[in-house]
């Protein structure tokens, strides 16, 4: 399948999902399957868990925008799911469990702007989050941390 079609599908799905309060984490088109399969992973914009009912509810508007776009001229199966475990780290147990894993840290600076930093999780204390950024340890004050999210190694 041509890359521009996949990009167009991602944009259409993202817009439809946003109207319902969701964001698309991943869209994959398995064009070699018969019928073709379009797989979407979603999450709530507010970070809450995604239910089976949420996936079902989002299926109709996303299916409609795909059909109306005429980008796909063959039969397909639309699968909508959640990515599984929440990728946002919140509890001390989660921070301990995912030590050494790639993370993305959202922080605020003095001017209240949001900054994203990617690195490997080292430790979290009441005062600091310690992450390894390209071999260099970075100590981030907990008061500046907005959110810590598991990331893929390529992020």
UniProtKB/Swiss-Prot annotation:
Enumerate the UniProt keywords alphabetically: Cytoplasm, Ribosome biogenesis
Annotated GO biological processes are: ribosomal small subunit assembly; translation
Q: Which InterPro entries match?
A: Ribosome_maturation_RimP (IPR003728), RimP_C_sf (IPR036847), RimP_N (IPR028989), RimP_N_sf (IPR035956)
Where does this protein chiefly localize?
cytoplasm
**One Pfam family from the UniProt entry?**
RimP_N
Top-level taxon of the source organism: Bacteria
Quote a single Gene Ontology cellular component term: cytosol
Give its localization: Cytoplasm
Read off the PANTHER family from this record.
RIBOSOME MATURATION FACTOR RIMP
- Function comment: Required for maturation of 30S ribosomal subunits.
Q: Which family does it belong to?
A: Belongs to the RimP family.
Q: List the protein's name.
A: Ribosome maturation factor RimP
């Amino acid at each position: 399948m041509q890359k521009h079609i996949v990009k167009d599908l991602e944009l259409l799905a993202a817009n439809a999902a946003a109207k319902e309060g969701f964001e698309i984490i991943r869209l994959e088109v398995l064009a070699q399957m018969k019928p073709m399969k379009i797989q979407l992973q979603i999450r709530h914009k507010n970070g809450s868990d995604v239910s089976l009912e949420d996936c079902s509810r989002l299926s109709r508007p996303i299916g409609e925008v795909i059909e109306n776009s005429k980008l796909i001229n063959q039969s397909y199966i639309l699968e909508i799911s959640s990515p599984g475990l929440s990728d946002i780290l919140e509890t001390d147990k989660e921070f301990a469990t995912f030590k050494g894993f790639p993370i993305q840290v959202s922080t605020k600076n003095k001017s209240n702007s949001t900054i994203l930093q990617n690195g490997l999780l080292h430790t979290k204390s009441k005062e600091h989050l310690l992450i390894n950024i390209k071999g260099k340890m970075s100590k981030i004050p907990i008061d500046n941390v907005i959110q810590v999210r598991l990331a893929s190694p390529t992020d």
